[in-house]
Amino acid sequence: GITAMIVCLALYGLIPKPRADFVVAGKPFTEQYIMAGLLAQELEEAGFSVEQRLGMGSAVVYEAIRNGTVDVYVEYTGTVWANFMSRESNPGRQGIRSGVVGFLEEQNVTTVGFTGFQNRYALAMRRDRALELGVTSIEDLIPIAAELSAGSDLEFFGRTEWFRLRDLYNMDFADKLTFDVSLMYTAVAERQVDVISAYTTDGRVAAYDLLLLDDPRNALLAYDAMILASANAAAQPKFMQVLDTLVDSIPDEAMRQANRLVDVDGESITVALEYLRGEMTKN
């Protein structure tokens, strides 16, 4: 009777759960939680079981996709180019794309395709402040940068991209302050700084009505969002078929608004995901 039941339960507790068909991963920021949710949903709707591993660091998730402990996640071309390939040049958006895809192939990682949006660094200002100073591009900052203050996330001012921007435009700001990301946006919104290094699909760009400045000298890298798959997952035609529908399906603005729902409006990832699915141009 009861003893048998206890023994039974004890044994049952020792049986490992079967591994999900696919492990979907993501890094620790809103856009990545949304994209991991999207990948998982697409695979689940196709009948696969999925485990999500969220909040993984860049280097960790990249290692995991190479050795197959993770099957799929969304990466950015600029991250692979600068961090994993350690390249300091900027051959432009297409040059980076092809360089990155080729490099990943050698690493046993398959590029399923590009999602359609890019989340790159851009210098941004309050629209009214930019108008007041007559600024629409980084070139317009050259004569006035020495009187302006700039804010960035914790790493931008230490990156090759900033050094390239500084050198190509031959300018520097009077003050350079670093902030936690959300505080960086508040700082520019509240006029504590004139310019920030924004992320182009960040919802706060829309919420605070920031103007993204053009970069005519191509100082800043392209960061196309790309779906990466492990060798094992990529060898399964149905898996590739399912994710192929996501290629070129998400415009920048749709991603920005989905991020805004979470970061500004306080909605759940689920709500943002539903919104995004409604905005997608499915193949």
PLM feature spans:
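An extracytoplasmic/periplasmic, membrane-proximal ligand-sensing/linker region
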Residues: 4, 8, 156, 161, ...
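Ligand-binding "clamshell"
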Residues: 84-112, 190-193, 204-218
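Soluble extramembrane regions of membrane proteins in the secretory/endomembrane system
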Residues: 113-114, 169, 199-201, 216, ...
